[in-house]
């Protein structure tokens, strides 16, 4: 069972020159610094899933010399990472390439012996990444099982002894009783050679991957027949799956897409294999397929949307000593983030730098960050990117900043009001492909004094401090002598159009005018929570026409996060989180912005866009938002849950928790029992029930943990889905890793019902 050959044949790549070169392997120069370049051997393994890298480190385990292609975010040709930009300028770009990983491990910067070798690696890896992504769940499952078989086949004779079979089951994360394993082994060993080969391994594979819960559901739908007719499939789609579009057209399109048997397809029928393929596909996912594209109205003012926003975007770790990196900006943009933070200070050689002021975090050039933003701003979404500037620079270096922004961003930069948009904020659609600046500004929407205006003006203490998040920095600003006050360069000020940073002076009372529509304030999480507690409805109304930015409290020097949900419930749009810090807060954040095609903008519910709204999440009364639902989740089973610690021999003991995040009365959590020693196909079949009063603000988080009686449970995987995007019926939930990346085959099988 050669999974690599299977993979190549499946995608017609068996004669591909690039992949042949990678399977053969070759020497590459690994680059770490100006003085550290070492030759190392790299080779694509036969499973076409992993790369082996030579290591000279003492005590290195064989597993640690492998990395999975599934962990690769991107392969870049040329000097396109900080490492190669700094340390390989002497080598032609066409020999240099970098492997950038999804998680927070270091980028692998490499130099090939020739341009042709570099091309083989870049194109070859690109093909595997592309084709792996296009495999359906059944193909992924088969490919994964084959690679586990290869690992277990210690003597490489393509046969499976009973001892190797036990190793194989451990690889699969399943503890099977020896007598049961021996029983299956004997059933499959037709040749009675005390080893399994070829068809015998296939038979074993089929017994292992049989899913009784799917068999049961299929039998119910067919009335115990071998296949589903179009009418039976329509009935299943209507009554179980609650599909609004259920009808013969949808049923036939599912048969066409997922039925592997040409005979069944010709007879307009679906077999059990086709049924499983459908349930494992995007059509059978718990997340509404229609919400994977932009489907909301994108023509409303910016203040009517939640905006995916990052705090201290330049950091990869904590705020005191962590590294700053342009890579952090690229990661945030690739995750759909639309508001980035740039903490700007004077740097050497008249070049502004970005870092966390008065700390030991490393420094990066402002121009390098702007270049990275230019290159990646619109890869994940076409909608506007807001650059939140925290400006500590001298006049001279502010002018350098303005010059870099203008020359590097060119027409992407919004540097004047849009025609006719002078009384309210423009919409995401009007700002498509544009980069906006948020920062201090002299005067109103139009530059003061035209051409002959002042060259620079002193900014008020309050407006300058309004932009400074760090309390130490803010108090320094407020105690500066007159000569040291921040003077703002007109060139930079004129680039701030619709996002002028101002000090928040309170909600206007009747008859007093508040902020201009293009003025916005920033609030620490504590101040925002206080405003929500004391004036929740006023905050909601303020946020109908004005943008509000929320940032983490100053004490969070470890870059921990706060819950964004309460801020969203108050209508706050730019709720900035530390994207570099995984955890439940980022899980919920990613879940919220998975909606609307993951474009980084999600339309707020109507009651958070109404200037006369009476909504207050802290004092919930009846209103248009009050549409109570009963949510019933039956957690049936799990599939291919990953090992928590790959170096441990232990098998996971999984349990599932389902959480509701929303207004405080809706917040709830229920859990299943623990299944011991089975991460491969655990079975719970447990019903969990919830009452949800404000479904438009609710998110459902499914968390799988490895139970540990003596310490904190280990995280295995999770998925967070807005309740409005959660599909009913029998569904698979595709689990994400701690860093928010998709586990290739890990799923939960559930049945969801939602009733008024």
Curated annotation (Swiss-Prot):
This protein's UniProt keywords:
Calcium, Glycoprotein, Hydrolase, Lipid degradation, Lipid metabolism, Metal-binding, Phosphoprotein, Repeat, Transducer
Residues the record lists as binding substrate: 438, 440, 522, 549
| Residues carrying Phosphoserine | 460
User: Where does the UniProt entry place glycosylation sites?
Assistant: 191, 193
What Pfam families does its record include? C2 (PF00168), EF-hand_like (PF09279), PH_12 (PF16457), PI-PLC-X (PF00388), PI-PLC-Y (PF00387)
Q: Where does Ca(2+) 3 bind?
A: 312, 341, 343, 390
The PI-PLC Y-box domain extends over 492-609
Every copy of the PH domain together lies at: 21-130
Where, by residue number, does Ca(2+) 4 bind? 651, 653, 677
One Gene Ontology cellular component: cytoplasm
Residues recorded as binding Ca(2+) 5, renumbered to this chain, are 706-708
Annotated EF-hand domain residues? 140-175, 176-211
- Which residues are noted in the entry as Ca(2+) 2-binding? 189, 191, 193, 195, 200
Question: What InterPro entries does the entry give?
Answer: C2_dom, C2_domain_sf, EF-hand-dom_pair, EF_Hand_1_Ca_BS, EF_hand_dom, PH-like_dom_sf, PH_domain, PI-PLC_fam
This chain's function reads: The production of the second messenger molecules diacylglycerol (DAG) and inositol 1,4,5-trisphosphate (IP3) is mediated by activated phosphatidylinositol-specific phospholipase C enzymes. Essential for trophoblast and placental development. Binds phosphatidylinositol 4,5-bisphosphate.
Protein name, as recorded: 1-phosphatidylinositol 4,5-bisphosphate phosphodiesterase delta-1
